[in-house]
Amino acid sequence: IETPGHSRAVILSLKNRYNKYKDIDPAKAEEFVVWDTKDTTNYISVQGYSDNVLNLAVPGTYRFVKRIIDELESMFNQAGVKLKTVHLGGDEVADGAWDNSPAIHEMMKKNGYTKIRQIEEYYIDQITEYLEAKGIKAGAWQEAAMKHPADFDKKVAKRIQSGRSNSRRS
């Protein structure tokens, strides 16, 4: 799976799902909202999109990613095979993708974060912890595993396998 960037198909599909259920089952509609409805950020990804990054400050993002992991695990189990690794992506998140997201700014304030990178670290921690509890290793591109504080690196290094991407993001 590719998160939080490269998620345009997910976002567009989940917006259609939201519109399908918003009037008949609002709770179901809200379950997988992976965007901040009040976000006014304008960004362009290296792929040329302005709508391809999951918002890491909304609960629907975590519910959705965990559901995908659960579904993958179920499919592997049905095939009689252990799911050993899930690659989370982590590369090519457009610079400034969350600049005007009230949800991001609220999360930063609530948690005492001073950098957006700390929200990305929170996301990596939450999802790799979820995978670890299931006995599944996490994989990610190098960007997801670099430039973190030493204590975070130690914590996550045992959970994540990293590889290089061709991203232009530093």
Name every feature range the model reports, one short phrase each.
Residues I1-K134:
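Substrate-binding cleft of carbohydrate-active enzyme catalytic domains
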Residues R8-Y18, G139-R169:
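Substrate-binding cleft/loops of secretory-pathway carbohydrate-active enzymes
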